[in-house]
């Protein structure tokens, strides 16, 4: 079947770390417009006065993308990409690259099988660790994605990615770069469990029952299932996180206040705003990322083995 075959030696932690960050950046490059559309749909309706002043209304994934291209230009779909890539190199490297190592750490000595609880603990741990390191990049990414640039008074607040870090720190304090870290930790712990644990289990069962071999089709099916589960369980927290991180100072007192206002003003369905682009983005992102990740691990191990070989 297509793809590199597994290496004789299991991949090292450093190989997984590098492969995860690189694969996540590649997945971001391909799916970033869907992520931007998701952010626009999630924040739509949170400020009715601002919404009424906008000429652009978003309806559905394709409608959002087409509206953005028409009113802001195609480059708007990739607004915040630099921060997004910075985020993945610091975020995915930890939550994906260290997952197996943390899973082994939680697995009791003498056991050759990791329980579901062990995998969930590993997913929560690496997800929380990754957010703690990458939170400022996520804040900047969302600020860029949420801002409209129409040329009709929609001037850019930030001249670039580094200017965004400096401006947020100057105007909102250093804490502004860590705004929404609690809902983000919650969201990414859930997403990481949904992604890594589901991928781990589906892949394991497909191989145990000899339904597929350890190659592209197996990785594709496992990644698609992981993307759906992650979107389903994490969407409510993701909407709250996006709105809170994008909000101006004083709009919400806390993530909990943001959640209450969403329920009272828009109803419980607001928690699943942007679900379709979330799934399209997370599902496609997972497929691209995990397939690339598996192949990169094998390629890097082959390079390492060739380098270590005396001949």
UniProtKB/Swiss-Prot annotation:
Location relative to the cell: Mitochondrion inner membrane
Biological processes per GO annotation: adaptive thermogenesis; fatty acid metabolic process; lipid hydroperoxide transport; mitochondrial transmembrane transport; response to cold; response to superoxide
Mitochondrial intermembrane side: 1-10, 100-119, 200-216, 294-311
A GO term for molecular function: oxidative phosphorylation uncoupler activity
Membrane-topology descriptor: Multi-pass membrane protein
One Pfam family named in its UniProt record: Mito_carr
Solcar repeats: from-to residues: 11-105, 114-205, 214-299
Ranges annotated as spanning the membrane: 11-32, 77-99, 120-136, 183-199, 217-236, 271-293
InterPro entries per the UniProt record, alphabetical: Mit_carrier (IPR002067), Mito_Metabolite_Transporter (IPR050391), Mitochondrial_sb/sol_carrier (IPR018108), Mt_carrier_dom_sf (IPR023395)
Subunit structure as annotated in this protein's UniProt entry: Interacts with HAX1; the interaction is direct and calcium-dependent.
Identification of the protein by name: Putative mitochondrial transporter UCP3
Organism field: Bos taurus (Bovine)
Origin organism lineage: Eukaryota, Metazoa, Chordata, Craniata, Vertebrata
Annotated gene: UCP3
């Amino acid at each position: 079947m297509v793809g590199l075959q597994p290496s004789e030696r299991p991949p090292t932690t450093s190989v997984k770390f590098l492969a995860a960050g690189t694969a996540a950046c590649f997945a971001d490059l391909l799916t970033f417009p869907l992520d931007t559309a998701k952010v626009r749909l999630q924040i739509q309706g949170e400020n009715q006065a601002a919404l009424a002043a906008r000429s652009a209304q978003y309806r559905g994934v394709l409608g959002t993308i087409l509206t953005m291209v028409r009113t802001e230009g195609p480059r708007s779909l990739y607004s915040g990409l630099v921060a997004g890539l910075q985020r993945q190199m610091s975020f995915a490297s930890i939550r994906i690259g260290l997952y197996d190592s943390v899973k082994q750490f939680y697995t009791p000595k003498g056991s050759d099988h990791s329980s579901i609880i062990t995998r969930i603990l590993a997913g929560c741990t690496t997800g929380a660790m990754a957010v703690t390191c990458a939170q400022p990049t996520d804040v900047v990414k969302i600020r860029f994605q949420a801002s409209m640039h129409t040329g009709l008074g929609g001037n850019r607040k930030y001249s670039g990615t580094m200017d965004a870090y400096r401006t947020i720190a100057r105007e909102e304090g250093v804490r502004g770069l860590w705004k929404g870290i609690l809902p983000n930790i919650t969201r990414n712990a859930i997403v990481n469990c949904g992604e890594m644990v589901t991928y781990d289990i589906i892949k394991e069962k497909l191989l145990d029952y000899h339904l597929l071999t350890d190659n592209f089709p197996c990785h594709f099916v496992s990644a698609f299932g992981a993307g759906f589960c992650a979107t389903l369980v994490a969407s409510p927290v993701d909407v709250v996180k996006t709105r809170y991180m994008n909000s101006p100072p004083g709009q919400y007192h806390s993530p909990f206040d943001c959640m209450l206002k969403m329920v009272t003003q828009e109803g419980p369905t607001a928690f699943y705003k942007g679900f379709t682009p979330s799934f399209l983005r997370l599902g496609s992102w997972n497929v691209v990322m995990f397939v690339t990740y598996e192949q990169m691990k094998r390629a890097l191990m082959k390079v390492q083995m060739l380098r270590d070989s005396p001949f």
